[in-house]
Curated annotation (Swiss-Prot):
Entry similarity comment: Belongs to the isochorismate synthase family.
Cited SUPFAM superfamilies: ADC synthase (SSF56322)
Pathway assigned to this chain's UniProt record: Quinol/quinone metabolism; 1,4-dihydroxy-2-naphthoate biosynthesis; 1,4-dihydroxy-2-naphthoate from chorismate: step 1/7; Quinol/quinone metabolism; menaquinone biosynthesis
Domain of life: Bacteria
Top EC category: isomerase
EC numbers for this chain: 5.4.4.2
Native species: Mycobacterium tuberculosis (strain CDC 1551 / Oshkosh)
InterPro entries, A to Z: ADC_synthase, Chorismate_C, IsoChor_synthase
Full protein name: Putative isochorismate synthase MenF
Cofactor section: Mg(2+)
Active site (UniProt): K119, E175
Amino acid sequence: MSAHVATLHPEPPFALCGPRGTLIARGVRTRYCDVRAAQAALRSGTAPILLGALPFDVSRPAALMVPDGVLRARKLPDWPTGPLPKVRVAAALPPPADYLTRIGRARDLLAAFDGPLHKVVLARAVQLTADAPLDARVLLRRLVVADPTAYGYLVDLTSAGNDDTGAALVGASPELLVARSGNRVMCKPFAGSAPRAADPKLDAANAAALASSAKNRHEHQLVVDTMRVALEPLCEDLTIPAQPQLNRTAAVWHLCTAITGRLRNISTTAIDLALALHPTPAVGGVPTKAATELIAELEGDRGFYAGAVGWCDGRGDGHWVVSIRCAQLSADRRAALAHAGGGIVAESDPDDELEETTTKFATILTALGVEQ
């Protein structure tokens, strides 16, 4: 926990917008890198609202804060919309051939007769450089304009300290991790995807193929089943549709399932729920421990990619989204790191999985003006 650190950038410390409105932080009163300390402040009333980002590995420092105040609005302010500086891909991390090798390693483990692993999400990254400092507000507005149904977000990561000081996470996630309003709980997990196409007939064919894909439906069901197990001790009257729905963004078709329920104990807060669910198999795997251990071995620290971004107020209400389709901007805003991943099961084709990550990169790279 530390005092507010001033920044030269005119960006807010936090913004989250979506179909139900926008929440923007004004200033920072207190910062927390320790999730448990932040939860304690919320429960004691010291923190009237808590907001920020959770890393993929919650044993790592978080980027949570208590703001001086918040602005709630229907949409984002009229932030700058001018052009961004030229952005280029400096490196692929790892190179595509190495990513294919990682998938092959995962498939061997998944196919093992007595192996514990059923699914693992493997990601790759691209390192980006800009000719001049990037404005995170411009990037966020571009993302939201491109997909108004997504959850656009911007988080100052200074609370996490060290290399994250001054950095910012900016993205537009299609995936709601969890929302709490009173005793009502809602989750909308995503797993299974296919690319969009400019030709309407091909686009419809891609959607239909996804909906009927045994591999993608299996991958999706693993996510839903795991979330059911996590939610049952916390919620009653769980409603989980038997079949997933199709959801589309500008670049990707997804399978998704809307899950609803009622809290068994009203003292369970939105951040409690987020921590109980994270990381879901949509970004980690099944079982969680085996999958996250393999991810750590093959990828190293993911940082805030595939974590969660959101807020929780003193009543326990809040929204948390999965931090995908994003980039972490460096403190000087002249560099960025973007990730994309895909769910690997025994039936996965490595080339298809590589192509899936390329498709998923499109959201953030298009907003940055990167030629693909």
